[in-house]
């Protein structure tokens, strides 16, 4: 039975990936990769058919079990008090929202906007979140008017159900998957004057994050699957983290690597590098930028969780494919990968979403430097959290959506209960503060939900002291701009 399920889930995952590749613009088509995926899918389907015939013969009662779609009543029964499930569908001319709460109240409403119109709105908002600038004072103002317009468009039909809600379970569609709903204002807002502390005026904005905790879900069926998992003690225990892999021999020789920076009044803020592969005809691991700041982040989370780094923190050359595949994940409640997420076509021969690990040029014989979606499917996890802290896997690009769906689906199949992913390249100091605060809160309050722990950590960063110049004894800028506090989203339960 396990073999049949494995073949099915691999075929399903590859089929979704093939569908996504077929849906991109003609100039982005990858015919060779599509053909290879088709061959793999057919092979897996043949294997599954063979195994099913064997199961029917030897275990006829198992063959009678079939997956059923989640009905409205089943969806309601999945919910706890204070939870609201909201799903979207974006169409060519009109879109739709559907919501249900634990009491059984249901709302279904059209949205007077097409998929392309909503995509343009999302892209407009993301200009201030992923601006590609190199100075703090060059960060654009966040478009509060457009954000509130989108809030009204998407959520006004279901406001009645949200009035007393504490947790919004969100099933986004298309471009909505790259927009953290936490950044939507719940009332019209005009940005005031920040004064000496730059960005402090954003603290007065009535963000949705101040009212609700939010979890994203791949589907309603995924919620059903996750909530069927056996319960376990709330306290976090063991941890394993992989970070700052080395993608070339040159990186291995360098004591330090220059990273992208935002400079403010002479004080640099580091942003994590992202791969610059657009227009590159032939790409290898060596083109990927190193992520040196992620090593300290992995170590800090180990300290917060009171885990000995020896045997739990694998950085640089140790962050390799062989190490990942050989690790025993039994009891590892938090699994962290601080590296790049890649999609088909990013590198030569890459046919599946993958995580980039240390190159075989650095550690010969330790794998090909890629943890593919299919290899993730084969991991045996029982993790409350899988953290993808530097992947930018929820990016606005079609490729980013493909990465988060492919990698996310694989980790859920492998046994993860929730993912923590970023929606744009994070500012490294704020990201490290947010990440460690999140796990500090979960350790201090074991019953605290994942989404609520993230929400509280966001607010603490937003309302906190910000970047303090120790010599001057004052805050130069706060982390209240959503670029700093809103990149991470919880996907799962």
Residue ranges and their predicted role:
Residues 1-15:
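Short, charge/polar-rich alpha-helical segments
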Residues 2, 20-24, 28, 90, ...:
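Charged/polar helix/coil "stalk" or linker segments at domain boundaries
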Residues 8, 12, 42, 451-454:
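Conserved positions within tetratricopeptide repeat
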Residues 16-19, 23, 46-49, 53-56, ...:
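Non-catalytic alpha-helical coupling and interface elements of nucleotide-dependent molecular machines
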Residues 18-44:
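Short, Lys/Glu-rich amphipathic helical modules
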Residues 36, 58-493:
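Catalytic cores of enzymes
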Residues 36-63:
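Amphipathic alpha-helical coiled-coil segments
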């Amino acid at each position: 039975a396990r073999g049949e399920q494995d073949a099915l889930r691999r075929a399903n995952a590859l089929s979704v990936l093939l569908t996504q590749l077929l849906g991109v613009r003609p100039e982005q088509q990858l015919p060779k990769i599509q053909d290879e995926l088709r061959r793999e899918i057919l092979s897996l389907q043949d294997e599954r058919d063979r195994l099913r015939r064997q199961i029917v013969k030897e275990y006829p009662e198992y063959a009678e079990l079939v997956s059923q779609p989640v009905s409205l009543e089943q969806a309601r029964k999945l919910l706890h008090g204070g939870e609201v499930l909201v799903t979207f569908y974006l169409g060519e001319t009109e879109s739709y929202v559907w919501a249900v709460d634990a009491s059984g109240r249901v709302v279904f409403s059209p949205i007077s906007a097409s998929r392309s119109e909503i995509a343009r709105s999302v892209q407009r908002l993301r200009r201030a979140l992923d601006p590609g600038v190199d100075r703090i004072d060059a960060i654009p103002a966040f478009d509060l008017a457009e954000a509130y317009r989108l809030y009204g468009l998407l959520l006004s039909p279901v406001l009645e159900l949200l009035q007393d809600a504490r947790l919004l379970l969100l099933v986004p569609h298309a471009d909505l998957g790259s927009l953290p709903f936490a950044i939507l204002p719940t009332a019209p807002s005009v940005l005031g004057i920040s004064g000496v502390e730059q960005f402090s005026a954003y603290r007065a904005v009535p963000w949705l994050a101040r009212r609700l905790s939010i979890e994203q879900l791949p589907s309603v069926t995924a919620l059903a699957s996750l909530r069927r998992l056996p319960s376990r003690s709330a306290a976090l225990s063991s941890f394993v983290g992989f970070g700052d892999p080395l993608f070339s021999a040159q990186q291995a020789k360098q004591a330090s690597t220059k990273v992208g920076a935002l400079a403010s009044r002479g004080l640099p803020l580091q942003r994590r590098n992202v791969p610059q592969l657009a227009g590159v005809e032939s790409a290898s691991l060596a083109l990927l930028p190193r992520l040196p700041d992620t090593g300290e982040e992995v170590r800090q989370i180990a300290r917060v969780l009171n885990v000995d780094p020896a045997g739990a923190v694998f950085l640089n050359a140790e962050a390799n494919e062989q190490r990942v595949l050989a690790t025993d994940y039994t009891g590892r409640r938090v699994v962290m990968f601080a590296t790049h997420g890649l999609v088909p076509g990013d590198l030569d021969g890459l046919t599946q979403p993958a995580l980039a690990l240390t190159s075989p040029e650095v550690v010969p014989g330790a794998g090909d430097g890629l943890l593919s979606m299919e290899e993730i499917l084969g991991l045996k996890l029982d993790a409350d959290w899988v953290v993808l802290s530097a992947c930018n896997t929820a990016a606005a690009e079609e490729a980013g959506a493909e990465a988060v769906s492919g990698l996310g689906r694989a980790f859920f199949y492998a046994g993860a209960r929730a993912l923590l992913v970023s929606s744009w390249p994070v500012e490294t100091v704020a990201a490290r503060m947010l990440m460690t605060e999140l796990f500090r809160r979960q350790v201090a309050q074991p019953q605290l939900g994942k989404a609520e722990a993230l929400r509280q950590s966001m607010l603490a960063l937003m309302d906190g002291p910000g970047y303090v110049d120790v010599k001057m004894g004052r805050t130069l800028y706060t982390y209240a701009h959503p670029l700093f506090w809103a990149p991470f989203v919880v996907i799962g339960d």
